[in-house]
């Protein structure tokens, strides 16, 4: 099973960490298993609490039901239902920037 390097960045939170995430595990779950505290609420892709923004790489977030096409095109991702499909970099704690 392939895994990918996911870099999680948020200057305000002092976060700049790269973790290995299997391609069948949600990024939020993998981060928590490695002791990284990211925001979340529903864990089902139905709200925006866990929103991040991809600056490099790709994910599969087909389970999400909250983001519209424009937000997805802009790079927003819900980490609670996002599987990595390549090495990627995600700016975390982006909920306020969605609106």
Curated annotation (Swiss-Prot):
InterPro entries: 2Fe-2S_ferredoxin-like_sf, 2Fe-2S_ferredoxin-type, 2Fe2S_fd_BS, Beta-grasp_dom_sf, Fd_pln. Keywords: 2Fe-2S, Electron transport, Iron, Iron-sulfur, Metal-binding, Transport. GO terms for biological process: electron transport chain. Its cofactor is [2Fe-2S] cluster. [2Fe-2S] cluster binds at residues 42, 47, 50, 80. Residues 4-96 form the 2Fe-2S ferredoxin-type domain. Gene3D superfamilies: 3.10.20.30. Binds 1 [2Fe-2S] cluster. SUPFAM superfamilies: 2Fe-2S ferredoxin-like. GO terms for molecular function: 2 iron, 2 sulfur cluster binding; electron transfer activity; metal ion binding. The keyword Cell division does not apply. CDD domains: fer2. The keyword Iron-sulfur applies. PANTHER family: FERREDOXIN, FERREDOXIN-2, CHLOROPLASTIC. NCBIfam families: fdx_plant. Forms a complex with heterodimeric ferredoxin-thioredoxin reductase (FTR) and thioredoxin. Belongs to the 2Fe2S plant-type ferredoxin family. Principal electron carrier in NADP-photoreduction. This is Ferredoxin-1.
